[in-house]
Regions:
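Peripheral, non-AAA+ core regions of ATP-driven protein-machinery
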Residues: 14-179
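Single conserved hydrophobic/aromatic residue that forms the stacking wall/gate
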Residues: 1-9, 13
Length: 179
């Protein structure tokens, strides 16, 4: 999954995940034919972003979440989508939308997210890396617990790729957001 800024306060992940904020009262809307596990991942990402911004690490007004509504959409709504592996990407897109800090256009990321920000391993890594490489994205954040999976892949898949292993989503924020 690839992250690139489309407009201020609106993020798009290679036309796969979009997050916008707008005036509101804290509402959170999900669209794009997501399954239950993916919806749970989005909910975890929202809770995590609220917790890290309320602690003052990022410059977000403490009342921001009460004064804004959020909409997360995954295009191609006719296509069912599910699984936890977009959690890190959703959290990164949400933090970018909330702070206005753009995400580097040359990165992709994958990983299940916990409420405490841990990045858990995912399946389908080969396909995700191939998709990134095909899209011309060679910097990919991958759960550290997937390192053995990467090492088992054919060199033709990983050659020319900068695979960045992470344990916590804060590592992704530090390297993927354009501070």
């Amino acid at each position: 999954l690839h992250l690139s800024i489309r407009r201020q306060r609106q993020m798009c992940i290679r036309d796969r995940i979009e997050v916008i904020t707008m005036p509101g009262k804290g509402e959170f809307k999900l669209t794009g034919n997501m399954g239950d596990v993916m919806k749970e991942s989005a909910s975890i990402a929202v809770s995590y972003i609220k917790s890290v911004t309320e602690k003052g690490r990022y410059k977000v007004d403490t009342e921001y979440f009460q004064k804004h509504a959020f909409h997360l959409h995954i295009p191609e709504g006719a296509t069912p989508k599910d699984g936890p592996s977009a959690g890190v990407t959703m959290a990164t897109a949400m933090l970018s939308a909330v702070t206005g800090i753009p995400v580097r256009a040359d990165v992709a990321m994958t990983g299940e997210l916990t409420l405490r920000g841990r990045v858990l391993p995912i399946g389908g890594l080969k396909e995700k890396l191939l998709a990134s490489k095909t899209a011309g994205i060679t910097n990919v954040f991958v759960p550290e617990d997937n390192q053995a999976d990467v090492e088992e892949l054919d060199a033709e898949i990983t050659d020319g790729m900068n695979i960045i292993y992470v344990n916590n989503v804060k590592e992704v924020f530090a390297q993927a957001l354009m501070h």
